[in-house]
Regions:
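Hydrophobic-ligand binding "helix-grip"
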Residues: 49, 59-110, 118
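Conserved strand-loop elements at the edges of beta-sheets that form or border functional pockets
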Residues: 11-13, 52, 75
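Hydrophobic ligand-binding cavity/cleft-lining segments
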Residues: 1-44
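Hydrophobic pocket/interface hotspot
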Residues: 18-22, 58, 73, 84, ...
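Short, highly charged C-terminal tails/helix-capping segments
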Residues: 38-41, 46, 147-152
Length: 152
């Protein structure tokens, strides 16, 4: 069994803003660096968005309107917890990897945000490679892009 990867950051905004910014994934996700469109077509995706509810979908839209399913929302508890079954444009696997994001108040203007990705075994023979790839990618995505979006 492969260990989960966990990243913890502190963002300069309140808990509600931290959660809402994360949920507005299209406003901060660097589609020119990490997307199914870049991997498959060599183009920047048009958008990525999520339906904000349990069972909602996280979908990337390409420049020509093709949709890639990134995952399915499991938990959508505003200001506290967001989780999704995640496979980012790969053919859906069941079970998928799991991304959980927890939001904890530090004070009125700061929030601790912890992102954990687990269940690597869902990727079968590619599990170790996927874990290694995402381990590096979350630094750019979460620690840089998301944190910068929270700072405004």
């Amino acid at each position: 069994m492969l260990d989960p990867i966990t990243f913890t950051i502190e963002v300069p905004c309140n808990q509600q803003q931290a959660f809402e910014t994360f949920a507005d994934i299209g406003s901060w996700w660097p589609l020119d660096k990490r997307s199914a469109s870049m991997r498959v077509e060599g183009q920047t995706a048009k958008s990525v968005s999520l339906t904000p509810k349990s069972g909602g979908k996280v979908i990337e839209v390409t420049q020509d309107g093709t949709e890639y399913l990134w995952g399915t929302v499991r938990d959508y508890n505003p200001n506290e917890l967001f989780s999704m079954e995640f496979h980012m444009g790969l053919p859906p696997v069941d079970p998928a990897s799991l991304v959980e994001v927890r939001f904890t108040v530090v004070d009125d203007e700061r929030t601790r945000v912890e992102l954990t990705q687990s269940n690597w075994e869902a990727f079968g023979d590619m599990a170790e490679m996927m874990r290694g790839g995402y381990g590096g990618s979350w630094g750019l995505l979460f620690e840089e892009a998301y944190k910068a979006a929270c700072a405004g």
